[in-house]
């Protein structure tokens, strides 16, 4: 994430008309690190403080600084929240256990994100105030959920109760990232992009488009998904259950604050 921004800005500066070329970089909500309630609201201007071991966030911070100090006249940096895309309901990776159930996100619908980029690229009269700015990218108030709530909604859409698929303490209780934005509406004012899509309908569309092997998950015998799918996933590298099983001191300290807190 560090090399490309530097390469792109250098390439723009080498053009005969660099001041007329816009350079947009994509950052992440991860740049501001762990935001536990009651500090779960955030804005551009908050300290950049990535979570422990989050090299992704660290690289995004370096990339953001590179673009800001590139010397270009037209640049913008978009700190994207979690992207609600077609495959989000199918994610089965131990990294999902890094999310804290009491954490929050203001999701960005993938169609909204695409519309924003399209509007910037195709509108040569985009509001001049947009350039030379850093923005939080989210789909607004309807898309603000706690992680527990959004997971519950997605599992319910498959016809199951989340509590039958995994236990609460299979997930970290700290050291993730996420916040609800106090300032994401400002980007919408400058470059309108939000569709106002209903979250529940969007979840239903994702589930309806999933393979049949996945949509049948809610009708499996109780404990089947939990013990034969979710538990083995959580025991893989980077999974919280593996940290606990192996009593990994660094992992347990980072994601739970100690073995007794798990």
Report residues per predicted region.
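Active-site YXXXK catalytic motif of short-chain dehydrogenase/reductase
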Residues: 56-60
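Structural signature of the Rossmann-like NAD(P)-dependent dehydrogenase/reductase core
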Residues: 22-27, 76-82, 106, 136
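Conserved sequence/active-site signature of Rossmann-fold short-chain dehydrogenase/reductase
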Residues: 31, 83-85, 142
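Conserved Rossmann-fold NAD(P)-dependent oxidoreductase catalytic core, especially the SDR/UDP-sugar
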Residues: 1-55
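Substrate-positioning beta->alpha
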Residues: 99-124, 133
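Mid/C-terminal beta-alpha module of Rossmann-like enzyme folds, strongest
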Residues: 120-190, 196-202, 213-221, 225-262
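C-terminal beta-strand-loop-alpha-helix "lid" module of Rossmann-like NAD(P)-dependent dehydrogenases
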Residues: 85-97
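Conserved beta-loop-beta element that borders a ligand/cofactor-binding pocket
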Residues: 61-87
């Amino acid at each position: 994430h560090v090399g490309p921004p530097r390469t792109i800005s250098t390439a723009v500066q080498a053009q005969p008309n660099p001041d007329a070329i816009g350079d947009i970089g994509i950052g992440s909500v991860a740049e501001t690190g762990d935001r536990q309630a009651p500090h779960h609201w955030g804005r551009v201007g908050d300290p950049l403080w990535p979570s422990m071991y989050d090299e992704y966030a660290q690289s995004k911070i370096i990339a953001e600084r590179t673009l800001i100090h590139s010397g270009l006249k037209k640049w913008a940096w978009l700190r994207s929240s979690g992207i609600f895309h077609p495959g989000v309901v199918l994610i089965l990776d131990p990294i999902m256990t890094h999310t804290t159930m009491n954490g929050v996100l203001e999701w960005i619908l993938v169609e909204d994100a695409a519309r924003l980029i399209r509007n910037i690229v195709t509108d040569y009269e985009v509001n001049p105030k947009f350039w030379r700015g850093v923005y939080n990218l989210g789909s607004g108030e309807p898309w603000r959920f706690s992680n527990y709530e959004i997971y519950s909604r997605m599992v319910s859409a498959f016809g199951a109760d989340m509590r039958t698929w995994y236990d609460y303490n299979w997930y970290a209780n700290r050291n993730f990232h996420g916040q609800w934005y106090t300032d994401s509406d400002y980007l919408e004012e400058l470059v309108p992009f939000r569709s106002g899509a209903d979250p529940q309908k969007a979840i239903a569309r994702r589930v309806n488009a999933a393979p049949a092997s996945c949509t049948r998950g809610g009708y499996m015998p109780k404990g089947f998904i939990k013990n034969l799918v979710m538990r083995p996933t959580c025991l893989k590298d980077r999974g919280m259950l593996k940290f606990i099983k192996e009593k990994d001191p660094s992992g347990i300290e980072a994601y739970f604050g100690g073995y007794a807190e798990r």
